[in-house]
């Protein structure tokens, strides 16, 4: 992968630990197909209220403290396709800091899938109060045309998200297990959550028969210290 600034560019060879990307659509499809084979699982949508009195809940909705200074990783991305070969599919540009920072942390991310198709994201590390940071479409358009030099392209799809870079509020309800970002599975230094979710899921499965009595799953103290 590569890291760029306004004055320098570095390529880091990590052959033993290759960067990997998972197609979320294919991932959800595989999991949903597996879940559908279990007759004791039902899916409900558009439920506004649930009765917690006789239920055990796995909750993925973070309880976010009302703190305007909380740090978020918020991003918008587009998958673009060009008529001519443009990208080096062997190198992901993990962070390009050659862009307006506006006293926060701002970078662009480029993940090539092949020579003429790539995902490009604008990413900010900031609070969510400054609306001037959120003209994402214009940021992407300017970066693609002016920094990458791509004048003609089509957009296959768009994505967006906001990842809390702080630990959510935890309740002591022994009828609820918080999972995902709500369960503190996000690495605060990177925003990465996926692998920690897999480890938490294994922990839940291993202890499912005594789920109400097990200790809360935490990231290793080493990673909490580093974050």
Task: Enumerate the predicted regions with their spans.
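A conserved beta-strand/loop capping segment in the N-terminal third of enzymes
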Residues: 1-36, 40-44
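Short, solvent-exposed loop/turn segments at secondary-structure boundaries
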Residues: 16-17, 130-134, 189-193
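Predominantly flavin-linked oxidoreductase catalytic cores and closely associated redox partners
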Residues: 30, 34-155, 164-172
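A short, flexible beta-alpha/helix-coil linker loop
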Residues: 9-11, 125-127, 183-186
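Catalytic cores of enzymes that engage adenine nucleotides and/or redox cofactors via long glycine-rich
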Residues: 158-163, 181
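An active-site-proximal "capping" alpha-helix that borders the catalytic cofactor pocket
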Residues: 140, 144-145, 193-211
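Short FAD-binding loop at a beta-strand-to-alpha-helix junction that anchors the flavin cofactor
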Residues: 110, 115-117, 173-189
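Active-site-proximal substrate-binding core of FAD-dependent oxidoreductases
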Residues: 165-169, 202-227
């Amino acid at each position: 992968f590569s890291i760029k600034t306004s004055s320098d560019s570095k390529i880091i060879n990590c052959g033993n630990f290759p960067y990997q990307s998972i197609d979320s659509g294919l991932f959800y499809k595989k999991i949903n197909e597996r879940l559908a084979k279990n007759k004791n699982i039902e899916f409900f949508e558009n439920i506004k209220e649930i009765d917690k009195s006789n239920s055990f809940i796995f909750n993925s909705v973070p309880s976010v403290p009302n703190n305007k200074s909380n740090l978020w990783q918020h991003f918008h991305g587009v998958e673009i396709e060009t008529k001519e070969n443009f990208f080096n599919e062997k190198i992901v540009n993990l962070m390009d800091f050659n862009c307006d920072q506006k006293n926060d942390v701002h970078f662009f991310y480029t993940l090539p899938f092949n020579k003429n198709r790539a995902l490009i994201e604008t990413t900010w590390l900031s609070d969510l109060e400054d609306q001037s940071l959120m003209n994402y479409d214009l940021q992407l358009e300017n970066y693609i045309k002016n920094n990458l030099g791509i004048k003609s392209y089509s957009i296959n799809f768009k994505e967006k998200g906001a990842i809390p870079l702080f630990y959510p509020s935890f309740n002591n309800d022994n009828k609820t297990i918080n999972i995902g970002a709500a369960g503190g599975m996000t690495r605060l230094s990177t925003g990465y959550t996926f692998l920690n979710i897999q480890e938490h899921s294994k922990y839940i499965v291993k202890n499912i028969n005594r789920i109400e009595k097990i200790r809360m799953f935490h990231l290793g103290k080493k990673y909490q210290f580093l974050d």
